[in-house]
Amino acid sequence: MLSKILNFFNKNYTKKGEINMSCNGCSSCNSMFCFQCEQTAWGKGCTKFGVCGKDPRVAALQDLLVYELKGIGFYGEKLIEKDIEIEDRIDKFVMDGIFSTLTNVNFDEDRFVELLKEAEEIKKELKGKIAQCNCNAPEEALYELPEDKESMLKDAKRAGIMYNAALNEDVRSLREMLIYGLKGMGAYAHHAYVLGYSSKEVNKFFYKALAAAANNSLTVDDLFNLNMELGQANFKCMEILDKANTESYGNPTPTEVLVTKKKGPFIVVSGHDLKDLKQLLEQTEGKGINIYTHGEMLPCHAYPELKKYKHLAGNYGGAWQDQQKEFDKIPGAVLMTTNCIQKPKDSYKDRIFTSGVVGWPDVAYIQEVNGKKDFTPVINKALELGGWKEDELEKKILVGFGHNATLSYADKIIDAVKQGQIKHFFLIGGCDGAKPGRNYYTEFAQKTPKDTVILTLACGKYRFNKLDFGTIGELPRLLDVGQCNDAYSAVKIALALADAFECGVNDLPLTLILSWYEQKAVCILLTLLSLGIKNIH
């Protein structure tokens, strides 16, 4: 297993002789190095400009923020060892800070400068709580952040992935795997936190893992074990997020969702943030504005406390990578609540808004004040633009098969398996992406035999979720489990079926066909591996 994981990363970055090792995101030249996502240049790493739209300056500031977070991790771990409590606001900063560096989240230099300054203050605060530290603090803990942005950019080369040319490649790969897993888990922890849910166990692991990423004494085996530990921590984190979502908005139930346009003003909501959607629905009720989900917000239609709003009209478009085409000259407003944002085209830059950790230079941002967001600018823009002029012929798809809904069919599923009506289960899902060849997932789904069931989740579902797969008895052949974090639901379903058949998960007639794009997929992969789940393709 270890060799496969190392190969996963080693094959995705440029070898030492192929890039300028001394320059990583500094301000004096057009250079960077980032290999955290699937679409990196030539499959090795972005060295001039990010395929995602990230420029070298933003890349450098992100690297430096991760560097600062490693320093915070060092002092945080020391405090935890001494049973000294770390305040919730610092836990939140750590998860939000690491989340902000995830692919397609934030591209705003000034926001990163603010985060860096806050990180430096927190690092000093934590250091000040340790009376004596008879230990060798890493450079990340001792580093002092300069005041101005240009100096930060000059310093950022020390934070670059490839800065230490002598570092063992396997150690580098496992460190980066750990950091990318944290970025994904940071997203899930953030979404749970804004709903009032968190786990001290998960929060403590952020400090432990960040400190480990700066610890030069750790071996390949040490780092491998930490990656598996991260997988377990992320499973707990996804469990907390599932609880947050279901206790706040109810258990998802099978629901038909309109995927065609309705006449009138509208707002498209993209990302993953259920709380933002709830607040927007409250603020638009009775105003004649339709609300459409986009991308990973599609599963929101299945939550009782969200779908009770009649103006939650439907789902618009497909996965994240099509947004520049789908939002082009759109006669409505767009709200980006989390990743994935792409560079807005001029044709809709005046009507797209960001919130939470999302940022793009010169794009309107909706601030949160005392836990509330005022979406008046978004609402006014939607009314000003007027919306679509006529209805389209209706088409609907089915969502809402989280673990609670799917397991309500457990007896029927078990009987169908025993009677030979269901021969196999395929989980086809994960992050979608723009690279050619992803029609593989469409073709795979189409070729699955009619006596098999397809479970799907995350935005990879858009490759086939508008196709008709029919039914097996009373059960649809295609079951939409939810967002990427609902991998937790998929695991719960698999574990429940394994219990029912008195076998292990790997003995089930189950195959996982996964796609990846960014770091949430990395932490989910680590979770699956840490649970010992096999048959992953």
What residues fall within each predicted segment?
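Anaerobic metallocofactor- and corrinoid-dependent redox/one-carbon enzyme cores
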Residues: 22-41, 46, 54-58, 62, ...
